[in-house]
From Swiss-Prot:
Organism field: Haemophilus influenzae (strain ATCC 51907 / DSM 11121 / KW20 / Rd)
GO cellular component, one term: plasma membrane
Protein name as annotated: Peptide transport system ATP-binding protein SapD
Pfam short name (any one): oligo_HPY
Gene: sapD
Keyword set, alphabetical order: ATP-binding, Cell inner membrane, Cell membrane, Membrane, Nucleotide-binding, Peptide transport, Protein transport, Transport
Transmembrane segments: none
Length: 349
């Protein structure tokens, strides 16, 4: 069952020069109890989508969607107050740069205790006194911090990046959310610390059944932990599929470029071996290409790519491309004409 179901999400930002469309018709579906990945380079709209889900919306954002459901509740149709209450209870987010999200003038212990909501107390009334401190210690132990006394007595600037990230995870799970969004949780972390964070999130998914959405610009690093991956480019869906299928046989050129950009160290590389890169640069927000936004950089682009590609589906594999790769032309035509693979966002309402 889909815990989060988003169809045709558009995010525009009102500026002095008019509206700029950042996210263009994105679909996203998260099944309950799974770890899903949202992959794309900087500027693809990953963080914007995550903030919209968490209701961290600015006044100059214009948000529309055919469907924006969380557990069968249409979030965009709720009043701001009801949406804030629902999201605050059911969804948590771990932001980038954890140390910058903490109050530098207050100790970690006080911030963590203040972040624990009263409704999570489910014990006898006489155990109320001091329960938040006990709960804070329990949360720190759960995220792998054994020496809780030093951490709780420290200020944010006295923590390492890894400790700061673990503290942010402890704060995020204090309200026992059904959905946890981790916005590039291993950004700027050492490889060993990043591995600890991924293992921690994975154990939370397995032990507590928490649904997790990971955003990243490194498709290989999160492919080891995610059940499903969706790829974005400049605010548009390119491809979505179960992780193993997506990595082994991507149908969109951009997904293939992301995979090729990661060096394969299983075999020795030759002297001055060039890394796999996609030619060109991402367009600026004010000058997005019409149609497929990858068109100017795509090695397979043709005139038809000036039209926005339809979103097609073959079994569990969804992609938006006029000229998909890793598909035999004959089989592709047979599959796409035999059944209606064009996704209809309004069909399930």
């Amino acid at each position: 069952m889909a815990l989060l179901d988003i169809c045709n999400l558009n995010i525009e930002i009102q500026t002095s020069n008019g509206r700029i469309k950042i996210v263009d018709g994105v679909n996203l579906s998260l099944n309950e109890g799974e770890i899903s990945g949202l992959v794309g380079e900087s500027g693809s709209g990953k963080s914007l989508i995550a903030k919209v889900i968490c209701n961290a919306i600015k006044e100059n954002w214009i948000i529309t969607a055919d469907r924006f459901r969380f557990h069968d509740v249409e979030l965009l149709k709720l009043s701001p107050n009801k949406r804030r209450k629902l999201v605050g209870k059911e969804i948590s987010m771990i932001f980038q740069n954890p140390l910058s999200c903490l109050d530098p003038s207050r100790k970690i212990g006080k911030q963590l205790i203040q972040n624990i909501p009263n409704w999570t107390f489910k014990n006898k009334w006489w155990k109320w006194f001091g329960w938040k401190k006990r709960r804070a210690i329990e949360l720190l132990h759960r995220v792998g911090i054994k020496d809780h006394r030093d951490i709780m007595a420290s200020y944010p600037n006295e923590l390492t990046e890894g400790e700061g990230q673990k503290v942010m995870i402890a704060m995020a799970v204090a309200n026992q959310p059904r959905l946890l969004i981790a916005d590039e949780p291993t950004n700027a972390l050492e490889s060993t610390t990043a591995l600890q964070v991924f293992r921690l999130l994975s154990s939370m998914n397995q032990n507590q059944g928490t649904t997790i959405l990971l955003t990243s610009n490194d498709i290989k690093s999160i492919s080891e932990w995610c059940d499903q991956i969706s790829v974005l480019y400049c605010g548009q869906n390119t491809e979505s599929a179960p992780t193993e299928i997506l990595i082994e046989s991507p149908h969109h050129p951009y997904t293939q470029a992301l995979i090729n950009a990661v060096p394969d160290f299983t075999q020795p590389l030759g002297f001055k071996t060039k890394l796999g890169t996609l030619e060109g640069t991402a367009p600026i927000l004010e000058q997005m290409p019409i149609g497929c936004r990858l068109g100017p950089r795509c090695p397979f682009a043709q005139k038809k790519c000036m039209e926005k590609p339809r979103r097609l589906k073959i079994k569990q594999h969804e992609f938006s491309c006029h000229y998909p790769i890793n598909l035999r032309e004959k089989n592709f035509k047979e599959k796409t004409t035999a059944t209606p693979f064009i996704l209809n966002c309004k069909g399930n309402e």
